[in-house]
Amino acid sequence: MVDNSQVQQIRDSVDAILNGRHDEIYGTVRQCVAEVLSIDPAKVSPHASLIDELGAESIDFLDLIFRLETAFGIKIPRDGIRLAAQDGLSDGFEYAGIVTAAGLERLRVLMPEVDTARLTSGFRSHQIPSLFSAETFVRLVAWRLASQTSAV
């Protein structure tokens, strides 16, 4: 069994921030996603895949992250979700491009918005961005906001 205490701490801090600010953060994320993708904000739902359903490309994520950093006064590290999932994982996050069982467990904890049926054996690390939704970025913003006030 993998020690997920730090990952769980991140999730708990995110949940605490979202307890009082989810709608506010989601509204800003939704607007930023719509602007980046040049679509009507009504088309952005919390769990729609930004890549598979809304047509985002990797360059769009750079623009989105910049907009979110500006809107919330935060810094979002490149590959933030992946880095948090890998932190302290001695067994390795991936092997030959395939996310390990320990890595999948970490992603399930960090990304509760993702249908666990998508995080199964054989999942490739390059597929992680296909999991990203507006809700993923809501949680990412909350993580960075929480880290401003704690050591998470």
Question: Could you describe each region identified by the protein language model?
Answer:
Residues V2-A56, D60-F66, T70, I74-V152:
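Phosphopantetheine-dependent thiolation modules in NRPS/PKS and related acyl-activating systems
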